Amino acid sequence: MAETSKQVNGDDAQDLHSLLSSPARDFLVRNDGEQVKVDSLLGKKIGLYFSAAWCGPCQRFTPQLVEVYNELSSKVGFEIVFVSGDEDEESFGDYFRKMPWLAVPFTDSETRDRLDELFKVRGIPNLVMVDDHGKLVNENGVGVIRSYGADAYPFTPEKMKEIKEDEDRARRGQTLRSVLVTPSRDFVISPDGNKVPVSELEGKTIGLLFSVASYRKCTELTPKLVEFYTKLKENKEDFEIVLISLEDDEESFNQDFKTKPWLALPFNDKSGSKLARHFMLSTLPTLVILGPDGKTRHSNVAEAIDDYGVLAYPFTPEKFQELKELEKAKVEAQTLESLLVSGDLNYVLGKDGAKVLVSDLVGKTILMYFSAHWCPPCRAFTPKLVEVYKQIKERNEAFELIFISSDRDQESFDEYYSQMPWLALPFGDPRKASLAKTFKVGGIPMLAALGPTGQTVTKEARDLVVAHGADAYPFTEERLKEIEAKYDEIAKDWPKKVKHVLHEEHELELTRVQVYTCDKCEEEGTIWSYHCDECDFDLHAKCALNEDTKENGDEAVKVGGDESKDGWVCEGNVCTKA
């Protein structure tokens, strides 16, 4: 905020009139065409709302802002001015009709552009709070409104500090009642619509479930969570779940909630967003555990329930230590067959469609390739992997690769797999879910390596293939150390720093970089770069040390700042003394 504040509030700062007016206009407009003098805003806090009809996030945020505006405008001096980013007047008009506040006329593009530049608007929705003198009060209005609503008025740094201090006090003094009870509500609801007093939940272990029914990860957790909840009830444990739905559609909330066995806050309860802040919600689904005393026992046990089910209860530190030991034992006992055999599913597919028994792969180094045709980085990486696979196979190594698809249909799977020379898990195979969980696949492409015993060697094999190609085989820590020693030997006589005409601002320092793009030849490089960390600038050793006076002028490179780089011979990514 400091830079924008300095520009807006500095010595050359404008008052509200000059901020919102133009030489030909001293008014703003309402959506019915009424003109409102800018000077009538004196004494009010103003929100400048940069938004546009074509922007989906804007369309979703505007109703929230309308609610806050309606609550504040009738009680305190607060006004909003819409600064449109629409591309035509019709779109502006249609969108503006949803807003109860003022706007800079669409025809005054000069003022709209000036405000964009003054407040450094680089994305929308953007809500900037100013006072009646035009001075910047808060440039994060969207985040403030989403988090605190009207409670944040007058949006000043002092008010934001006060809110933060109140939140800290609430966390320190947390009880079940402070979490779930509001001045207007002392109950939660059951799926049949009955009110359940919060007092009936006191003394129990409580799970607060933050969820959105339409979100895939929430949907995937639900069956396991229902099973977990049902088993605890059968065991007569003092445990309850309270759903805090972040749905914005009441029908979706009702359709989802009526099929669940647990309790919930009423739809659109304003304490939902407050609780999301209170527990510093960062992901969905989140299941916060409160102990019988109402204090937070664990910030999110969703993954623990997904992995261990009822074994994770009651989520104490001692229980998690037990689970850690179980996981360690599971990892140590891992074999290829424990990963890939599930009931009758004891095979993978060969290129001819034949079933290849998992038992026939035991004792080999295996790469597990999580990928999909719809994923551009996957399509870019696969040809490189095909090349490396063939090179390793030509050496008659005990090696194989298995494709684990995230494609969306059989046709896409077949088309993508036709480009691959290796094995595959059948499309839609249920083993994919357990493999993705075991290797914690958060994104694709991902390449995990298993050693001959079936133990995981690395989950970062993709980086090793990109950096070292077939030389990375068998992808072990020992092999990586051998490669690094080789490159250290190659680079031991290279200058540690150079100056180059393509980057005269700073010296370039010899740096170990896994993968980069050379800023001279624009080709990929690995391992060693002449690098400027401040500017994120990289040169291959050959590009930094090879003289090319025709391209770069005389004395293109000075080693150590003074000495010529004569005497170096560079081939590929390697430079050696002549």
Curated annotation (Swiss-Prot):
GO BP term, example: pollen tube guidance
**What Pfam families would the database entry show?**
C1_2, Thioredoxin_8
- Tell me the SUPFAM superfamilies matching this sequence: Cysteine-rich domain, Thioredoxin-like
- Which key words tag this protein in UniProt? NAD, Oxidoreductase, Repeat
Q: Which domain of life does the protein's organism represent?
A: Eukaryota
Gene Ontology cellular-component annotations? cytosol; nucleus
Family as reported in the entry's similarity comment: Belongs to the nucleoredoxin family.
The protein's name in its UniProt record: Probable nucleoredoxin 1
Protein source organism? Arabidopsis thaliana
